[in-house]
Amino acid sequence: MAVGHYDLKRTKNKQYYFNLKASNGEVILTSEMYTTKAAANKGIRSVQANSPAEKNFEIRENKSGKSYFVLKARNYQVIGISESYDNEVAVKKGIQSAIKHGSSVNVRDLTKSE
């Protein structure tokens, strides 16, 4: 069975973030920026803990009218944001993918190669 994974990355200005990726390599959601690697890893653990419950997802609409979803922690803080989708069916499929792959413990630390 193929599983998703997390890619932990660092920006040029030394901020950390992660992407949750599906087994096919597509980005499901992206985190906020973190000032430390430890904080980004804590964010990954929060996604792992909160993604199995559909109630933690919220569908929103951006300024151009496209749908996207956010994943919220128990304290209602947004811990991940999806890409934009053309319709509600597609955004719901994205949520199901996040539920399926979010509990993955496979974290690829791409900051080591920088």
UniProtKB/Swiss-Prot annotation:
The residues forming the signal peptide are none
List keywords of the entry alphabetically.
Repeat
Q: Which Gene3D superfamilies match?
A: 2.30.29.80
Q: Where are the sequence repeats?
A: 11-59, 62-110
- UniProt-listed InterPro entries: DUF1508, UPF0339_domain, YegP-like_sf
Q: Return the similarity comment.
A: Belongs to the UPF0339 family. Duplicated subfamily.
- Spell out the protein name for this chain: UPF0339 protein plu2779
Higher taxonomy: Bacteria, Pseudomonadati, Pseudomonadota, Gammaproteobacteria, Enterobacterales
